[in-house]
Amino acid sequence: MKKVSFDFDGTLDKKHIQQFAIELINSGVDVYVNTTRFKKFDNSDLFEVVNSLGLSSDKVNFTNHTWKAEFFEDNNLEFEWHLDDNYEEFFHFRRLKSKTKVIQVNSGNWKQKCIRLLNL
């Protein structure tokens, strides 16, 4: 099963991104949420979205303000792609030569890139 990753703030908190995530889930793609948030704080808004997508809490990773590329590497996580709005995250994915492709959600063709990488 193909695995993909979504940032939350500025990405999966948007309705049209949530709709895309639902389409992927319905196509059999394994969807994860990776956020730089701290787990110890109130994340009710995040879990409201996660629950609405039908995802279990084990599909959510809190990096506690560690760069996601470093978190992925340290935890042996690999995804087909990670969708994010933070330009600094892109720098770190490239610096570490991550196998996970990172896609900028603010680019005009982010959805097409995601679909192409999944061969859907």
Residue ranges of model-derived segments:
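N-terminal intrinsically disordered, low-complexity tails enriched in polar/charged
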Residues: 1-5, 117-120
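Alpha-helical substrate-recognition element adjacent to the catalytic core
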Residues: 2-69
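C-terminal cap/substrate-recognition subdomain and adjoining C-terminal extension
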Residues: 43-120
